[in-house]
Amino acid sequence: MQQGQMAYDRAITVFSPDGRLFQVEYAREAVKKGSTALGMKFANGVLLISDKKVRSRLIEQNSIEKIQLIDDYVAAVTSGLVADARVLVDFARISAQQEKVTYGSLVNIENLVKRVADQMQQYTQYGGVRPYGVSLIFAGIDQIGPRLFDCDPAGTINEYKATAIGSGKDAVVSFLEREYKENLPEKEAVTLGIKALKSSLEEGEELKAPEIASITVGNKYRIYDQEEVKKFL
């Protein structure tokens, strides 16, 4: 590590001379070590798919959940530090319920994501804290229709037709840029998503037990069971 960088990488609130916040960059590196996940809009809804790697045969596979229900019509998938993800998912759930109780309507997904992003951004500018080492993809249905956003450790948000996070992000995004088409039927979208995840695997690796969830216009969040998932592998 260069001596100039060492002077700045310990302080989250200090920019380096070339305009970098090293702790935020390190948080992004933590995300790159996480499981690959993607989100995609299809004809009348949106889906989330995540690789689910079990690091030990002693772990109960069903205890690992990468896709999290936020509200009946909103879900999120995370990649990075699991504990950080849990805190932000709980924050999103509380925010969604507060909006639902206040306004009595579908949760505005963009506003929800902005609140989560604001929480993450605050942890990039105060001393005594560190950035969240996690990225999230939010998917759901609101008054506008199907929505898909991602949020990174800096609190940056973007809306997408399809996107990915985690260790295989670059490979998955490259695949989707070539192959993605708007308004696909749900089954075709899932098939495409599985192919995209497989494109990120190392030689000899297998996609054994991905998680798949969808939300469609007029229908609540649905997680695919194991038998349904096997049909797409």
From Swiss-Prot:
Superkingdom as given in the UniProt entry: Archaea
Protein name: Proteasome subunit alpha
Entry's Gene Ontology cellular component terms: cytoplasm; proteasome core complex, alpha-subunit complex
Role noted for this protein: Component of the proteasome core, a large protease complex with broad specificity involved in protein degradation. The T.acidophilum proteasome is able to cleave oligopeptides after Tyr, Leu, Phe, and to a lesser extent after Glu and Arg. Thus, displays chymotrypsin-like activity and low level of caspase-like and trypsin-like activities.
Effect of residue 82 to D/G: Prevents PAN to stimulate gate opening
Keywords: Cytoplasm, Proteasome
Effect of residue 66 to A: Prevents PAN to associate with the proteasome and stimulate gate opening
PROSITE patterns associated with the record: PROTEASOME_ALPHA_1 (PS00388), PROTEASOME_ALPHA_2 (PS51475)
Consequence when changing residue 81 to A/E/G: Prevents PAN to stimulate gate opening
